[in-house]
């Protein structure tokens, strides 16, 4: 059958229409696919516009079903490279860039010399010193151009937060100011679980970060200024990442914690953060501040051929040296101290940290701080040769070495040594070497960490500033640590960053259990709650039922605020509880008694009537024959320090002849240790009473003389106020010089020696050779708020504003 010719075009038209429709559909599908690809690409590689240019990060899923994905922005510059003429100078803002900067890989770390032979092992965590091969992978790319930070941004919204902006937590890594990098700590888990933005930073270390000549040639504290510059960058740019610049918390462990503590005392960091978490270290620790920077700078300059007399020429020579030559020099600091670290420059750190705390300079910040149960493990681990504990000789040697290096004055050293041994002997089990080992760990823990932390907490809480204290009692099972060890220095770090939730890593190679996962969730909840509200209990409740069926005992615990009277703290462990007065007796021993005991023999010179040394005491004791004191305490390598300008100490105590009327120090005693301690305490109280009586008598006599004076002409009150302020801010070094001068002038008059008592200030942290000395160019630590004074650092200036009269100190800018 034939089709009509008029209908022949219909199939052709239909075919054409189908082809056109298919083409359009194909194009539409292709465009849609491209669009979704671009969206997915943007989600996978997000781009953020900062004040200095655009950066592209990486969206990273985490290996746990309870953790959401995190955006990572790695190697973001926060300052210009501190190279060339910028070496030994404060940091400067970074340069802008065009286009999109790749921020998916870490940048170079700050120069450091990771040699196991020269590390300060006692001050570093075990996971750090036993993982040097792993750490080398993090620090192998070193460069002076190292001022970069890493940002971890969670993707999920917080149902407990109404504020769309997320709180920010900035981690300052530790490492005895000489080692470490922010790159080795992954903030992804903490950011995801706690729904906060976590930022880790690199800052200049060691010689490049803290070298100081003690004058204007090289002021020091460049590492601290790097941290402050990072905080300034965060304040300016964190909003682009969804962060709240008004809710910034800085936190750190070890040397990082002491940096955090120092930043709370510096005017340079005002307004850059609101809260601080101080883990195992404060500005009051003996190793927190370098009191003799010029000494170690001279040693370095001599080693590299830059030992010019003029400090400006010396620093210029050091600037021209290759950084590798500088950091590879071996400079050993005094035991329990540092060679290159923060210094009191009169500007960034305007005065001694204890004085600044007493003035209330850190009351603007909410603070959470604490210690681990066995911080002093590394000090003892090197002494013990096996698992059997500590022998009596090892114990005696450790105490003797400790006293010689921290309190190396000849006056009262024997009394102090015996008192410490008495305090740290478990008299119910004194023959047990394992008990002896435990008490020795406690000695170093209390002195280096606990006493400074409690003192810091007391000073911060005395005016009602929010303060929370914790004691960390848990540690993971690991072959890196001896089986007898408690929670050591740095053991809290993996729990803070949620490492148990993803399992062992090369850096934290522990056998994590469900209990470890639960405790890590608890710690992260406390830390991030504090960052959100300043209260570790709010807004997120403790709930870990999703981890295992065991009840979470932290649900029933309310972490109470710390105050100097009750001293409440949270025991963080598998059996949590709120307790009070953490190691109060030992803390009082170090803070109240020891500062008087270490110079006690000078007091004995006033009251003793002994004219010659008694014969050796061979009295029989239940545990053997009593030896002479010369054999009781093993000698150390540190030589005894002979007092200058005091001839009576140079006399031979065994010299025969006519009776010597010079009062001598009794070096051999026939009374027991208990009686020695009792007499020591009694003599201290007697000495203090004499001082108090003398002060009262002086005031009464002065008032009597003033009543007979004629009224003086009216004076210029403006000049008086200026004069009072100048006196008030006199530097610690100048005070020390005046004190020494007064004492020297009085040494010729024995009857007046009671009017010149030893200077007990800050004895917890000073070593014998750490007494500040003055040179023509020495910084005198005058705050830059004085009218007409120029700040020592040009990094940032502060106007001398009017202070509130309600503050604890006239120069304080903080709240009560």
From Swiss-Prot:
Residues 359-364 are annotated as: Interaction with NRXN1. This is Neuroligin-4, Y-linked. Its main location: membrane. Residues 1-43 form the signal peptide. Glycans are attached at residues 102, 511. Expressed in fetal and adult brain, prostate and testis. One of its GO terms (cellular component) is symmetric, GABA-ergic, inhibitory synapse. It is found in: Cell membrane; Postsynaptic density membrane. Homodimer. Interacts with NRXN1 in a calcium-dependent manner. Interaction with neurexins is mediated by heparan sulfate glycan modification on neurexin. Interacts through its C-terminus with DLG4/PSD-95 third PDZ domain. The gene is NLGN4Y. Residues 649-658 have a biased composition (Basic and acidic residues).
